[in-house]
Regions:
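Short glycine-enriched nucleophile-adjacent loop
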Residues: 195-206
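Catalytic-loop region of hydrolases
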Residues: 51-140
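Bacterial Sec-dependent N-terminal signal peptides
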Residues: 1-53, 235-240
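Alpha/beta-hydrolase active-site loop
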Residues: 161-179
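A catalytic-pocket lid/entrance helix-loop region that shapes and gates access to the active site
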Residues: 209-249
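Alpha/beta-hydrolase fold nucleophile elbow
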Residues: 182-192
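Short beta-to-alpha linker loops that shape the active-site pocket of alpha/beta-hydrolase fold enzymes
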Residues: 119, 145-149, 218
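Glycine-rich "HGGG/HGxG" loop immediately N-terminal to the catalytic nucleophile
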Residues: 148-160
């Protein structure tokens, strides 16, 4: 009787505390649930805000079907994108291909350099790559791989669409789209065949860019130019020229 008398108040205390304890537990669960919802909302907000910059703007260009981030020691952001281009810009119904375009970001208020590459763009993927004018002007960089080279090769390869005018049409489409992101001054530049491409781009679309800077721009007179042969027939010695000819054959 003595022990049962001492146990009874403890049981009563437990029973009397139970509603309070349950209330605290429910309140704690509601607090945790609210905190979890708030954290989820903040996380979603951060993810959304992370894409309100260049990446978000790239996603708004309908011609871009794929965007991948690239490492860069020169720019705050760098991406390789794949831009849908018609094989024939005058007749889009004839098909399309994906053109590789590399974008490097210096600032929305900065000028933009479009590199009119004459061949492939693989070297521009390197983290340390930065074109000279882009460095000098602290400018954005839009690097366009030439059609029918590397990852910008149509399938099947219908060579009728590999023309200077089609290349200029490609550059015009890229520039027009990216001016929605970079509305400042634009500079077109290229080296060798890329320089030739910059000149031809200016010829077909004289108002697309503010400045054209071709670094070397060989302009051919035709499929057979006619200016190289006289020089090659005289340079060096007969023996050396034959050796080079034999090596090529």
């Amino acid at each position: 009787p003595f022990l049962s008398g001492r146990q009874q108040p403890e049981e009563e205390n437990r029973l009397s505390l139970s509603p309070i304890t349950n209330k605290h537990i429910m309140k704690d669960l509601r607090t945790r649930h609210t905190a979890l919802l708030l954290f989820t909302f903040l996380l979603a907000s951060v993810s959304l805000s992370a894409q309100t910059g260049l990446q978000q703007k790239l996603s708004e260009i309908s011609a871009i079907t794929e965007t991948q981030p690239l490492e860069s020691t020169e720019f705050s952001e760098k991406y390789v994108t794949y831009f849908t281009q018609p094989l024939d810009h005058r007749h889009p119904e004839k098909g399309s291909f994906r053109q590789r375009v590399i974008v490097a970001h210096a600032g929305f208020d900065r000028p933009t350099v479009i590199i009119t590459e004459g061949y492939g763009a693989a070297y521009a993927l390197k983290p340390q790559y930065r074109e000279e004018l882009s460095r000098l002007l602290n400018a954005n960089m839009v690097f366009v791989e030439y059609r029918y080279f590397l990852e910008s090769t149509p399938e099947p390869k219908d060579w009728r669409y590999l023309t200077a005018e089609s290349s200029a049409d490609d550059l015009h489409a890229v520039t027009t789209a990216f001016k929605n992101i970079y509305p400042g001054k634009w500079i077109a530049t290229g080296i060798s065949k890329g320089g030739q491409t910059a000149l031809l781009y200016r010829t077909f679309y004289p108002d697309d860019v503010d400045v054209s800077v071709p670094y070397v721009a060989p302009l051919c007179y035709g499929t057979e130019d006619g200016r190289h042969e006289p020089f090659l027939k005289k340079v060096s010695t007969d023996e050396d020229r034959k050796r080079i000819t034999d090596f090529q054959l």
